């Protein structure tokens, strides 16, 4: 169905609902509930500023602060958005790719360049910090790591991962 849901607790939740779809691309609105999903109200009619794709995920850490992801149909690129007002406004995260100083082990062997690293996984909480893994496509076993110490406002390159 394309709907992506996240519940912070038994009552409070958010969902991306498809409002239009064409050629594998979906366009969404963001809705919220305070009664466990019985009633939903629209928080944002166009959370991705006209961009379409596949809803990648929703994560909220309290009733205001969270991340929402949108990936391209090919799963080779994605965008992560941060909100600090429960989803009313979203800001696309821009990672400082020009600060990368280390590369994944097989990058050159596979013929990749830094420009190929456009798939951002949903952020993971690590204590007070948040990390994003950036890969060439969904499910990759190695890539770049960026960390935010200020709830997604600013990101710094912190290394590579290889599983």
Predicted regions and their residues:
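Structural motif
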Residues: 23-29, 75-81, 140-144
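Entry beta-strands of beta-propeller and related beta-repeat scaffolds
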Residues: 11-15, 64-68, 126-132
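Eukaryotic tandem repeat interaction scaffolds
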Residues: 40-71, 77-82, 92
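Asp-box/BNR beta-propeller loop motif
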Residues: 31-43, 81-94, 146-157
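Hydrophilic extracytoplasmic domains
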Residues: 115-163
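Repeated scaffold domains used in trafficking and secretory/extracellular systems
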Residues: 1-5, 51-59, 100-121
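Short coil/turn segments at the loop-to-beta-strand junctions that recur within blades
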Residues: 47-52, 96-101, 162-163
